Amino acid sequence: MILRRLLLAGSLLLATSFTSAKKADGPKISATKFKDEPVNLFYFDDSDTVMFQDGKNGDVYVSRDAGANWDIVDGGTHWVTEDQAKSWREFTVDAELSRYEYPLVFHGKDSNRVMLLGHKCKGLDCKERTYYTTDGFKTVHLLMENGRHCAWAVSTPTFGEGLDLPKEVNDRIFCVVSGLHSSWAEANRLLYSDRFFKDEQGTEVPLDNGRAVSGVIRTASVQKYILAATKSARTNELALFVTDDASTWHRTEFDGHRVEEDAYTILESTSYSLQVDVVSTYSSTIGTLFTSNSNGTYFTRNIKHTNRNLYGFVDFEKISSIQGIILVNTVKNWEDVEKSNGVQKKVISKISFDDGRTFQPLKVGKHDLHLHSVTDATNSGRVFSSPAPGLVMGVGNTGGHLKDYLDGDLFVSDDAGINWRKALDDAHKYEFGDQGSVIVAVFDEGRTDKISYSLDHGKNWHKASLPDGVQIRAKVLTTAPGSTTLKFLLLGSAKADIGMEYYIISIDFAEMEERTCEEKDFENWPARLNEKNEPDCLMGHKQFYRRRKAQADCFIKKKFEEPAPEFERCKCTEEDFECDFNFVRGEDGKSCIPSRSLIAPEGVCKNPDDKFIGSSGFRLIPGNVCIREGGVDLDKQTERVCSETFKNPPAGQIVVEKSFFTADYYKDYFYLERKESSKGEDETVIMITSEQHIFLSRDHGKKWKRILEEEKITRIEPHRFFDDVAYFLTNNGDGWYTLDRGDTFRKFKAPLPPNQDKLPVLSFHPDRRDWLIWTGADECNGNGGNCHSVAYYTTNLGGEWHFLMRYVRRCEFISRDARGSSDKLVFCEQFENENPSNKHLQLLSTEDWFAEKRLHYSNILDFATMQEFIIVAIRGENPQDSLRIGVSIDGKTFADAELPANVQIPIQRAYTVLESRTHAAFLLVTINNMEDHEYGSILKSNSNGTSYVLSLSAVNRNSRGYADFEKMQGLEGVAMANVVGNVADVENGAAKKFRTMITHNDGAEWTLVRPPDKDSEGRSYACSTKGGKPTDACALHLHSYTERADPRDTYSSPSAVGIMIGTGNVGDYLSLKSKADTFITRDAGITWEEVKKGKYQWEFGDSGSIIVLVTESTPTKTLLYSLDEGRSWKDFEFSEVEMQIQDISTVPSDTSRNFLLWGKEVGQGKKPGLATVNIDFSGLKERSKHIPFNLMDASSVTEPNITANGPTRIAITAENYSTWTPLGISANAHDRIMNGNKTDLLICSDYNYEPQSDGSCARVAGLEPLDPKLVCTENPKAIEWYEPTGYRRIPLTKCQGGKQLNHIVAHPCPNKEEEFFKKHPRLRGIGLFFVILIPICLAATSGYYVYNHWDGKFGRIRLGETGSGGLFDRDSLLVSIPVSMVAGVVAVITALPLLVSSLWRSVSGYVRVPGGASSRRPYSSRDSFAARRNDYTGVVEDEDELLGTDDFDDDEEGDERNGQMKNNGHVNEAITIVFLF
């Protein structure tokens, strides 16, 4: 305590005060010096109490006299004050404050209700924690863990005004939490609870028409509105949802404008509308201002090209206390800025007096005035205005556009911005006091020792000096909230002997000899004037203020009493109405038209031409108080036509649109798919034809238009990670791109032409849409041999390119989310010493654009990046050496992959990295690389990609390295592969024969595919299965990846969960494709059935509720479609002329009801050229019935053993998707994951172990397992290691409980014995003593009691008598039953060792058991038994009781008994009986 007082005294010595004032002539000014910079300065409302924090050491200072004197506040953990810092109360929480968000979230109407956001860490493992209090931190309770963001429903004082909200809304809390089974942002959910999440997980908020939506990234509260932003994967576009009652939500509509992540700003709004500024498509520093209707649903454009900065701040401010006046800055040369990021913006200022409907320039006489605003604000608080009625100030200049801040002067208006005049030369900070009676300004272009002030609305100015000649650089000039006091605070910095020192200067006008204002000194001032200079109406009233006249020589002196407006009602006009629900503004901006089909009264509309009385489309803005009598009445109900109640009425028919092109064929096509959070209804397709013409369709091929006609586009590059984006490239380095699915296009210029190494020209960033790497060709114009590739990067869509590296082969951005690395992590392949002739390709990485670089490998073949792994193929030192594999998870540390010894790999020349999304990497290691004879083995890694085991041998691959391997979309762990079934013959030069294999546990076990029982015509197949299981002679085989013309034509769909379609045959091998039939499965490949004879192309639609088939390679004019998962099929004629169909397509998610056929007419009456046919199933009537979605479980199938370990559980992994239900019924379901028994998902796949034919797991002969103790060195937190068993947990499994075959015998890690025995406590010491002693004591006590009360004591002989019938008679049940039980237990314990040894001998004769007797042959005949009877072990003497021999036999019977004991056959029989028992 003494030390603390000394420190306090020392700090107060530093705070030396100076005073300089003349009581009558100017303000009283005092200065307090501080060693370190004050930060976080704020006032308590309606008081002179001010606080700030020392910017260096965090000490808190408080002043109770508006900054004249300061005291330090005693420290502690967390403190709260309820009396303006007069007293403090300490509180604690078991967490550190949040680093990413403001830690305190306040209730809008109850100051005692607060949430605290924090986190608690154990080592590197941190969990977000949210706490709450309802009594001002007297008690603190944990709300939830891992809540990403929480907020009160009632977050503002105005929320719920005018609504009769339920009481529970006052307790309601919204929290953004991670997905059920995914931590990705697109899986986030919004939950709410009215009980602080007690005894509940919370309820998902029904954001979209009563349906929960995934991907919630943030919520925000503004005035009476709550907004929630959601984002889907693979797009930057957001969906915003809004509510004004915390219960009913609506999706916002921005008049066709896109809203993107980090590209919108919610501005200061009113109680009757929201203001949102949305970034323009091509510039992050130019926006468009939107204003909503009263419920925040429909937004209309107010003004385009608003000025904003990269931090999201917008030059927008509402004039304080006056409704409807808005000051904005816009960009005059917006076209030039959007064309090039290097163009300097020309900013101009505008003002609106009608709530943003119209804008006009600011005027100083006849000159336009432009003011610096929010984007370069130099003071705290509001930029232009305060509660002082009508007074507005700003720094700027007159002329054509805004100049630099240092070139500006101070301007003032006292009529709310209608007229302006110059107040002071040069830029100044400024503040208002005493309701505008006093204005203070301080020079803001350098150091100053004076302040300026005005007492007449800025017309005349006076100066006052700072005390003792102090010269400061002004940082903050402020006053109490409300601008009603005569006291101001000025914070500034000054030069010290060493470094800087800081001053807080108190400026007090209270002691100036100014009288108190009287009634004659005030005027009734209209807040808004119309074009006729008359008081204007807004929201049904005119607004007036009683304010001091500019020339009055008095002070108002009403401390903490803000001026109150007076209102005068007006008659209703058109401006008092807005569009009603389900209506939007028409193109004229005046009418309101239906946004969707109207709802007519029941029984009214029988014909489309009938009429009914309904909404006019308008309604009075809620809160508007205009006088209806004698005014406009736009919301009067009107007569409507019944045809408006049907928008796109179901026709019950399939609609066809055919289009023709002059080209012979298409080179490629791409879908730019609209995601759930994206606006609009487009289904965009882009095609490049054989003539290099580019066509675009926004309606899935119904109508096409040619785009970029003047450009010589040679290739189209869709963005790998964002489905809205595509690039159109030429051979000279010019290019175009679209960010909005072809709605608009913008040109860019690359630094070099595309490379000539047949490598990807563009590399895309997984998370940053605008970041690109361009690999171009340099020095390639002449015939010289120095042509090489050079990489450049851009972070603004090609607006500016920066050199990255030369002599590269390929560069890639590396995803940050899975690795926790920098988003600037880039990997490049570069030729060593920038010399391609040496053939040494280095793998380098950087996190700062190669200002510094890291060398990982000096001689690689290639590298591949996946969601979780970076895999590198490394060359050996000599050409004949095999390739090695390097693996990294974090992009920094690589480890060599350990390949299994039981895979015989020759000199390794090729690896194929297969799809790896289930926490394990799949590699195809080529075994035979001879042309047309290629095959290899699939290896599967552990969770860090370093240890591999054999998954499947002899997998087919082609000469390009692609393998017949495909994972099922939508389900974890299901995959199919084609293997070479005649390996021995292939090694001798024979052609390959294929068989299809399937796995349901992510490659741990593979089986042949079970064939259907009968074909599509009801006939049995020529071969037969064995007990329903496939055999080598009879299984289903399907054509796979290497035979596809388009690799996008996969077996399965991400939304048609569980369904796969393929072409193939039933038999011993896969036959020719020309002889294939078409098959379908609905249970993820467990059972199959033949759909049709012949080979068909297929496509899924409407999340699997529609399946379309069209013949492959055969001219046709009909297709087949099914609405019940392929159980029944219907024909549909799509063309009058037969067509050769090359492909059938739909959107990649398979959620559309539109399909597109690609081909050409070949029949009679054909038209030349390429043709596309759109098939639209949208007209089919939907059923209103809902069928629940069922979790598929392989155990529900009649087959007894799907895999060696029993029935397989299949888990749906999509977090939220529209899924199919039979008969064309669309439903929406969240995923469900069944956590299986752990034994089912532990497979014999540990390093150097392999499964045996009997199902056991054994180590490969001569090989050793990985050192199990490595877990202790690799993970410092590990406390134990386990002896290897050969079993390994499948990386994707979510199983819980059950047998842990991989964790049987545990040992402590070095120096972790204490933690180990805490986890695995042993019985020892006093505990062991009592465990032994207590049973003995109980037994002795019981025995003593029974001995003294039992009538059958030792020594008594009773011949032929029964017991006495007493309680403890020996025949009493109370005695006989316990005696029997004890005797049985003793007999079992005695016999157990003998029984086990006997069983071991029996079992070891039939089952191979490693070690022991496993090597002995079972006896198959009497002779074989007799030949080895000496090896048989006799039963020891003590076994007689076990086998039932009577102890009471006399000695003469002993020999006979002993002789019987030597009869090994009888003994074996007896033992067998006991074993069965």
From Swiss-Prot:
InterPro entries: Sortilin_C (IPR031777), Sortilin_N (IPR031778), VPS10 (IPR006581), VPS10-sortilin (IPR050310), WD40/YVTN_repeat-like_dom_sf (IPR015943). Residues 1347-1372 are cytoplasmic. It is found in: Golgi apparatus, trans-Golgi network membrane; Prevacuolar compartment membrane. Residues 1443-1463 are annotated as: Disordered. Residues 22-1325, 1394-1477 are lumenal. Its main location: Golgi. The chain crosses the membrane at residues 1326-1346, 1373-1393. It is a multi-pass membrane protein. Residues 1-21 form the signal peptide. The keyword Cell inner membrane does not apply. GO terms for cellular component: cytosol; Golgi apparatus; membrane. Keywords: Glycoprotein, Golgi apparatus, Membrane, Protein transport, Receptor, Repeat, Signal, Transmembrane, Transmembrane helix, Transport. Glycans are attached at N295, N944, N1201, N1216, N1237. Gene3D superfamilies: 2.10.70.80, 3.30.60.270, YVTN repeat-like/Quinoprotein amine dehydrogenase. SUPFAM superfamilies: Oligoxyloglucan reducing end-specific cellobiohydrolase. Pfam families: Sortilin-Vps10, Sortilin_C. It comes from the Eukaryota. Functions as a sorting receptor in the Golgi compartment required for the intracellular sorting and delivery of soluble vacuolar proteins, like carboxypeptidase Y (CPY) and proteinase A. Executes multiple rounds of sorting by cycling between the late Golgi and a prevacuolar endosome-like compartment. Belongs to the VPS10 family. This is Vacuolar protein sorting/targeting protein 10. The gene is VPS10.
